[in-house]
Amino acid sequence: MARITVEDCLKQIPNRFELALAATYRARQLVQGHTPKVDAKDKPTVTALREIASGQVGIEMLKKVPS
């Protein structure tokens, strides 16, 4: 199992506060039923961080308000 680290995510979103918000918004979307963009074997929070680290989800999450 590959481990996800904050450093991997900070390469995509350098501001750790924006990173936390983007991961939170994306995790909420995943809980609500949105399709994951990476292999989703983990909890929604880990999946959201994996998406950010891979560059498939980024700062644009802050412009979208979760419903």
UniProtKB/Swiss-Prot annotation:
Pfam families according to UniProt: RNA_pol_Rpb6
Keyword line: DNA-directed RNA polymerase, Nucleotidyltransferase, Transcription, Transferase
Alphabetized InterPro entries for the sequence: DNA-dir_RNA_pol_omega (IPR003716), Pol_omega/Rpo6/RPB6 (IPR006110), RPB6/omega-like_sf (IPR036161)
Source species, domain of life: Bacteria
MF terms in GO: DNA binding; DNA-directed RNA polymerase activity
Gene3D superfamilies documented for this protein: 3.90.940.10
Disulfide bonds: none
EC number: 2.7.7.6
Record-level GO BP terms: DNA-templated transcription
Enzyme class, UniProt record, top EC level: transferase
GO CC list: DNA-directed RNA polymerase complex
SUPFAM superfamilies named among the record's database cross-references: RPB6/omega subunit-like
Record's catalysed reaction(s): RNA(n) + a ribonucleoside 5'-triphosphate = RNA(n+1) + diphosphate
Transmembrane intervals: none
Subunit structure: The RNAP catalytic core consists of 2 alpha, 1 beta, 1 beta' and 1 omega subunit. When a sigma factor is associated with the core the holoenzyme is formed, which can initiate transcription.
Family: Belongs to the RNA polymerase subunit omega family.
Function statement: Promotes RNA polymerase assembly. Latches the N- and C-terminal regions of the beta' subunit thereby facilitating its interaction with the beta and alpha subunits.
The name this protein goes by in its record: DNA-directed RNA polymerase subunit omega
